Amino acid sequence: IRFLKWEYINFDDCIINIPAEELKNNKPLDVPLANQAIDILKAMQAITGDKEYVFVTSRGKDTPLSENTTTKAIQRLINPVTGKPFGSGYMTSHGFRHTASTMLNELGYHSDIIELQLAHTNKDRIRATYNKAQWMEKRINMMQSWADYLDGLKNQGNVTPINKKVI
């Protein structure tokens, strides 16, 4: 997401179209977005809409945020249990992908749909050769449900803290 370019976002269809050359697996990816994500991106347009990248450095350059910048921002978030910043060792920006995968599996979504949304390649070569399903409607529903679930946690304050470090 740090390298998300405005040209990839299709606001009309609520989707991000990532070209093959931007991904490790060299395959294009269409990423459906929840309404909440679209709202955030529309708000970002007022800030960085004139830049190539959606999330840029604060130095006024058209340079995407560094991984360090996003990780440091996460580390400065306040732990609801201790009332102090999380600090290092608890979460990274990439860790949100792990969390989403785990929680979506726990919520009962099919792992194939989750893996496709995360742009993971099917390691079973025969299955990958024959199965070209994109499950777009299911992914749209999953992402909207995920965003609604997160909103519910945020709005109800019903967040169970996890006291283990992410390894």
Name the predicted role of every residue range.
Residues F3-W6, A20, E52, D62, ...:
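Generic secondary-structure boundary/loop-capping signal
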Residues V31, A43-V54, R59-D62, N68-L116, ...:
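Short, basic (Lys/Arg/His-rich) helix/loop patches that form interaction surfaces
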Residues N35-D39, A43, I47-K51, V56-D62, ...:
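C-terminal secondary-structure termini that scaffold catalytic or DNA-interacting sites
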Residues R2-A46, T121-N122:
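Conserved tyrosine-mediated DNA breakage-rejoining catalytic core shared by Y-recombinases
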Residues E7-I15, S88-Y90, L107-N131, G152-N158:
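Short, polar N-cap/turn motifs at the start of nucleic acid-interacting alpha helices
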Residues R2, I9-F11, K24-N26, A34, ...:
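Active-site-proximal structural scaffolding
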Residues W6, R97-H98, I162-I167:
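A glycine-rich phosphate-binding loop feature that marks nucleotide/adenosyl-phosphate handling sites
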